Regions:
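Extended, well-folded interaction surfaces typified by the phenylalanyl-tRNA synthetase beta subunit core
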Residues: 433-593, 778-781
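Glycine/proline-enriched, intrinsically flexible loops and inter-domain linkers
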Residues: 5, 55-57, 197-208, 218-318
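A carboxyl-terminal module marker
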Residues: 2, 23, 27, 459-462, ...
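Conserved mixed alpha/beta core segments that line enzyme active sites in large multi-domain catalysts
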Residues: 47-76, 261-262, 273, 279-354
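Phosphate-backbone binding interfaces of nucleic-acid-interacting proteins
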Residues: 1-210, 218-221, 365, 384, ...
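Mobile "lid/hinge" segments at catalytic clefts and subdomain interfaces of large enzymes
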Residues: 121-129, 139-141, 159-163, 305, ...
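Beta-rich nucleic-acid/ligand-interaction surfaces
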Residues: 39-43, 203, 282, 510-515, ...
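Terminal amphipathic helices with adjacent charged low-complexity linkers/tails
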Residues: 192-208, 221-231, 416-440
Length: 781
């Protein structure tokens, strides 16, 4: 992409040298691959008036006397068919270089010479192509009367002493607004801290008489227009704007050398016709591509009396002849513009031959739209189309500016306005980011004042609401890349210059204690000391595994783009994964083992956070298994691990029996499981697994486990333990009772308040009402 510094200077006052400006652009905005120096390209080239024209017999040449602003006329031989007396033309004097050859290996320097052996010719009257302004060699360039006088330098009249930057497009992939001079200049203003002179048309739409416009659902249209627009999917085309104009001679080129022609040439484009030149010029200016249809052909293709425009995906096998004559076979991701469902354009890429503007065109349908960049990237690669328009669309042109650019095109073309339709089903709200001054300075390592931050952002179009140190940053419609705090912080750092940030280490305090990390470390050490092994399993599991464990599939989040059919759900418990690992371990020649895992789980009942992201809980899952054990129950085996671990954490717990109707504990056997309580708070579940679960996983009978909520455990830990300087007294206490375990434990704890009490066994003979409960008691002597 080529960017003219002179064009930038029309919108920004530049207080630095060109060299410094180019350096700033390169360091803060975009990679500059090269600079084309045109400061002397148009030296010794003047505006002149042709005073006398005489045809040279038997040739196509004319002998011309021209006024170059001096006392005497200068003679030039000219072969252009459009040379005539009284016209203002462009003269390249002897000794000057023809501009189109300036950058060639052998530039063409003019002199004074004899034509046909006797007619002296001093320099030449130049055509637009020879001036390097494009176009065909069909005559000499003509200057509009009143805009210059004989003797004026061409470079002064058209501001041609310029530096043209060659930009690396890839470094602007995320900035579609910078693919237009206005957006690029706005960024330059922000970098320099200067006011940006924004064109009024970006904010002021077409003016209509009162009641002329009608507002519908997601659309605006003029009363006198019968244009219909249907967009099949707003994600394919968030906005589609059309205007209908009657133009007397659409192919008429501007006979005078113009700023539009010169700017198109600087960007590497050629002049084609009045309408097309305006659309191309506005694309270079704003970054918004436009397209012009022959309206009468549009109706003829659709076989209707009114325009019925549909924006839709291509159907299998659809073909379309493009403006360049190539017939493309559409792919399913191509977006098509259709007239009564007949394709007339490959959206964002190129128009169709069947609606091409030509010398017969009387009515023009102008299009300004926003299309899905993802679809257009596929279109670009599939069909090998790399036009200026699709280059911009594939960067993500904002839907916010289509209508205003269309309105400016209507004004520039200056035809008879016949109607409009603006459809915007996918026009979203501006991005809003809440941030504080301290957050900005903390991440950048700076001490920027609030006022400087606000001014910097406002200079490039952001709206800022200030509440003390808090800033509400509202992104302008053209900044489709702003979503999070870091995006805003990056803008400030870039615009003010990363090179201006002092390389000083931040005076941050060391990271605070991570209590969860410390808790996990202690649990890991404790369980490993007791012979358990830590495992790490996938956070994603299958529906089959959920059902095998008896869990409610509806309470798990399903992953839309899962990496495998076996990994479609985010787990809501660690136990199913541990049961699966237990099966794998039981196949090995080991008599007994215990495994555990600490990780995050997600359940729909946990809800969403403020950003709409599922809330998670950190859990500890544990399973103990033995091939053969006749001396104790699996429940109490698991309970020993749990209580030894909790003892090291300084947590006392109670147990409440699980009722069979409680759905949260479907995988546990109700008669052999209990809820783990820390005071009034439930922190987990412990128990033996149901036969149905064991059978599903093909596991041995001696199997139990627990799962505790580490977030809840963290609130109850007490690492401070009294140091004992004496031996501890150990004894067993057996109580025969009809009461349940929880009631008996409460009575024992009341009798031995300072002791560490661990249940040992519970025995109840068949047919007996009483049971024997044995506790292991340790007290200080």
């Amino acid at each position: 992409m080529k960017i003219s510094l002179n064009w930038i200077k029309e919108y920004v006052k530049i207080p630095v040298s060109d060299e410094e400006l180019i350096s700033l652009i390169g360091s803060r905005l975009v990679e500059v691959e090269g600079v084309i120096d045109e400061t002397h390209k148009y030296d010794d080239i003047y505006i002149v008036q042709v005073e006398k024209v005489e045809k040279i017999p038997e040739t196509h040449l004319s002998l011309c006397q021209i006024d170059v602003g001096g006392a005497e006329l200068v003679q030039v031989v000219c072969g252009a068919p459009n040379v005539r007396e009284g016209m203002l033309a462009v003269w390249i004097k002897p000794g000057a270089t023809v501009p189109v050859s300036v950058h060639e290996d052998a530039p063409f320097v003019l002199g004074t010479r004899k034509m046909l052996g006797k007619y002296e010719s001093n320099g030449m009257l130049a055509g637009a192509d020879e001036l390097d302004f494009g176009g065909e060699h069909s005559g000499i360039a003509e200057i509009e009367p009143g805009t210059a006088k004989p003797g004026d330098l061409l470079a002064d009249v058209f501001n041609l002493r310029d530096l043209v930057l060659e930009i690396e497009n890839k470094s602007l992939t995320h900035r579609p607004d910078c693919f237009g001079i206005i957006g690029f200049s706005r960024e330059v203003a922000g970098i320099l801290g200067q006011k940006f002179n924004e064109p009024e048309f970006l904010y002021h739409e077409m003016v209509f008489p009162e009641g002329e416009l009608v507002r519908g659902k997601d659309c605006i249209y003029s009363k006198n227009s019968d244009i219909q627009v249907q967009i099949s999917d707003s994600s394919l085309c968030p906005r589609y704007s059309l205007a209908l104009l009657k133009v007397n001679d659409v192919t008429d080129e501007n006979k005078y050398l113009s700023k539009v022609q010169i700017m198109l040439a600087k960007a590497g484009m050629t002049t084609i016709s009045r309408v097309v030149d305006v659309t191309n010029y506005l694309m270079l200016l704003t970054g918004q591509p436009l397209h012009a249809f022959d309206y009468d052909k549009f109706l003829e293709v659709g076989g209707s009396e009114t325009a019925k425009v549909t924006v839709r995906l291509a159907k299998e096998g659809e073909k379309l002849e493009l403006l360049d004559g190539e017939v493309v076979e559409c792919i399913p991701s191509d977006i098509l513009i259709t007239s009564n469902d007949i394709p007339v354009a490959l959206a964002g890429a190129m128009g169709g031959k069947n609606t091409e503007i030509d010398e017969t065109t009387k009515n023009v349908l102008l299009e300004s739209a926003s299309f899905s960049l993802y679809n257009l990237r596929k279109t670009q690669m599939a069909h090998g189309i790399f036009s200026e328009a699709i280059t911009r669309f594939t960067k993500g042109v904002s839907a916010g500016g289509t209508f205003n650019v269309l309105a400016e095109a209507v004004r520039e073309i200056n035809g008879k306005f016949l109607g409009l339709r603006d459809s915007f089903p996918g026009l979203g709200e501006p991005s809003v980011v809440m941030i504080t001054v301290s957050e900005i300075n903390s991440l950048l390592g700076t001490e920027y004042k609030k006022e400087l931050i606000v001014k910097t952002l406002e200079n490039v179009g952001f709206s800022i609401q200030v509440n003390g140190e808090e800033l509400t940053v509202i992104a302008p419609y053209w900044r489709t890349d702003i979503h999070i705090k870091e995006d805003v912080i990056e803008e400030i750092g870039r615009l003010l210059g990363y090179d201006n940030i002092a390389p000083i280490l931040p005076l941050h305090a060391t990271a605070g204690e991570d209590k969860m990390f410390e808790l996990k470390r202690k649990i890991r050490e404790a369980l490993a000391r007791f012979g358990a092994n830590e495992v790490l399993t996938y956070s994603f599991i299958s529906e089959r595994l959920l059902k095998k464990a008896g869990e409610d599939v509806g309470n798990s989040y399903k992953i839309v783009n899962s990496i495998s059919p076996e990994l479609q759900y985010i787990r809501q418990s660690l136990i199913p994964s541990l049961l699966e690992k237990t099966y794998m371990n039981e196949k090995m020649p080991v008599e007994k083992f215990a495994i555990f895992e600490m990780n995050e789980v997600y359940r729909k009942e946990y809800g969403l956070d403020k950003d709409g992201v599922p809330e998670g809980r950190i859990k500890l899952g544990f399973i103990v298994a033995e091939r053969k054990n006749i001396t104790e129950t699996a429940f109490y085996k698991a309970k020993k691990y749990l209580e030894e671990m909790l003892k090291l954490l300084g947590i006392r717990v109670d147990y409440i029996p699980v009722k069979s109707a409680e759905s949260d504990y479907k995988m546990f056997e109700a008669r052999r499981s209990a809820k783990i309580m820390a005071g009034e708070k439930e922190i987990g579940i412990i128990g033996e697994f149901k036969n149905s679960v064991r059978n599903e996983f093909k596991l041995a009978p001696f199997l139990a486990g627990f799962e505790v909520d580490l977030d809840e455990v963290l609130e109850n830990v007490n690492y401070k333990r009294e140091i004992s300087f004496g031996e501890r007294k150990k004894e067993d206490l057996t109580i025969t009772t009809t009461k349940n375990y929880a009631e008996v434990l409460a009575e024992v704890q009341a009798k031995y308040p300072e002791a560490e009490i661990t249940p040992s066994t519970i025995y109840q003979a068949e047919g007996q009402e009483t049971k024997n409960i044995t506790f292991h008691i340790e007290t200080k002597q």
